[in-house]
């Protein structure tokens, strides 16, 4: 990539701009010195200035209700444009395909994509010779928790995951919890050898099985934002790793990192840890 491209602020489309995460992304992109808000897409308040909607003052960027119209315009720009998607599991797959089709680089924080959908998007990005980033969690603290869990798994055979989120989250278990279990499974170890013949008096009482026989328990309550515990057990001891999100600003360093790096990639990568 040329020095001119690297020195020019990165133009960013935010899809789901009025959502809880989208609002924070708009603010972060607006405030960062090397990024510039190109467009804001949402189904609500179409035509209203996104800056006024978020209390940032007039930005002269009206909220668009059509991602396709925005991508058509972005395809005409001299420098590649990045799209950040924090929308809904039912919308994100087509959003990413559309972005790639128009040469817009996707950064995705929306969870709920199936493994098959992720594989299809990876193939689509490969054919376009474009980079894309999908990360179930953009918190650097969560990446560190997963790294600590990988290390701990060398010494513990029993582990379960509890993830807790606000009650507006549509998918369960969370993409972060699934990714945590998958990263532990990639060690080639099967956890939680059975000790007794279990029976559930209420279906699902013991959680859901993820990779490597790791159970995940999901909690949805108002007052929560995003929290995860990885609990290891052994005779005479419990080892608990926990990450708590108290403000969605914690995700912004990771989002900005992905925005800055995605145009340098030639394939889809899954997980923020691959950029660190």
From Swiss-Prot:
Enzyme class: oxidoreductase
Major localization listed first in the record, in broad terms: cytoplasm
One of the record's GO cellular component terms: cytosol
Keyword Lipid metabolism part of the UniProt annotation: no
Protein name as it appears in the record: 4-hydroxy-tetrahydrodipicolinate reductase
CDD domains: DHDPR_N
Gene3D superfamilies hit by this protein: Dihydrodipicolinate Reductase, domain 2, NAD(P)-binding Rossmann-like Domain
Pathway assignment: Amino-acid biosynthesis; L-lysine biosynthesis via DAP pathway; (S)-tetrahydrodipicolinate from L-aspartate: step 4/4
Annotated positions binding NADP(+): 44
Species for this entry: Thermosynechococcus vestitus (strain NIES-2133 / IAM M-273 / BP-1)
Subcellular location: Cytoplasm
Binding site for (S)-2,3,4,5-tetrahydrodipicolinate: 166, 175-176
Residues reported to bind NAD(+): 16-21, 109-111, 135-138
Catalytic reaction list: (S)-2,3,4,5-tetrahydrodipicolinate + NAD(+) + H2O = (2S,4S)-4-hydroxy-2,3,4,5-tetrahydrodipicolinate + NADH + H(+); (S)-2,3,4,5-tetrahydrodipicolinate + NADP(+) + H2O = (2S,4S)-4-hydroxy-2,3,4,5-tetrahydrodipicolinate + NADPH + H(+)
Statement: the UniProt record of this protein carries the keyword NADP: yes
GO biological process: diaminopimelate biosynthetic process; lysine biosynthetic process via diaminopimelate
PROSITE patterns hit by this protein: DAPB
UniProt similarity note: Belongs to the DapB family.
Function text: Catalyzes the conversion of 4-hydroxy-tetrahydrodipicolinate (HTPA) to tetrahydrodipicolinate.
């Amino acid at each position: 990539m040329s020095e001119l491209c690297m020195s020019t602020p990165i133009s960013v489309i935010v899809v789901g701009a009025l959502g809880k995460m989208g609002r924070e992304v708009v603010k972060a992109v607006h405030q960062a010195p090397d990024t510039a808000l190109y467009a804001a897409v949402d189904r609500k308040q179409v035509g209203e200035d996104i800056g006024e909607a978020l209390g940032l003052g007039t930005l002269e960027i009206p909220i668009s209700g059509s991602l396709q119209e925005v991508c058509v315009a972005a395809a005409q720009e001299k420098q590649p444009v990045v799209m950040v998607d924090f929308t809904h599991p039912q919308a994100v797959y087509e959003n990413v395909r559309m972005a790639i089709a128009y040469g817009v680089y996707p950064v995705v924080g929306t969870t709920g994509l199936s493994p098959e959908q992720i594989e299809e998007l990876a193939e689509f990005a490969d054919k376009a010779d474009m980079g894309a980033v999908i990360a179930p969690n953009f918190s650097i603290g969560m990446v560190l928790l997963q790294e600590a869990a990988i290390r701990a798994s060398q010494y513990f055979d029993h582990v379960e995951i509890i993830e807790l989120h606000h009650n507006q989250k549509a998918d369960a278990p969370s993409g972060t919890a699934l990714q945590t279990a998958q990263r532990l499974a990639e060690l080639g170890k099967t956890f939680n050898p059975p000790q007794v013949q279990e029976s559930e008096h209420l279906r699902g009482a013991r959680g859901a099985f993820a990779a490597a026989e790791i159970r995940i328990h999901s909690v949805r309550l108002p007052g929560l934002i995003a929290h995860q515990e990885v609990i290891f057990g052994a005779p005479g001891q419990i080892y608990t790793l926990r990450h708590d999100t108290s403000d969605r600003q914690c995700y912004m360093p990771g989002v900005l990192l992905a925005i800055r790096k995605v145009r340098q990639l030639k394939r889809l990568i899954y997980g923020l840890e691959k950029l660190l």
